[in-house]
């Protein structure tokens, strides 16, 4: 992941 602001679960 590059530049992840909000991880999607």
Swiss-Prot record:
It comes from the Eukaryota. Its main location: secreted. Limited to neuronal cell bodies, neuronal processes and sinus gland. The modification Phenylalanine amide is found at residue 9. It is found in: Secreted. GO terms for biological process: neuropeptide signaling pathway. Keywords: Amidation, Neuropeptide, Secreted. GO terms for cellular component: extracellular region. May act as a neurotransmitter, neuromodulator or neurohormone. Belongs to the NPY family. This is Peptide tyrosine phenylalanine 2.
């Amino acid at each position: 992941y590059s530049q992840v602001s909000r991880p999607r679960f």
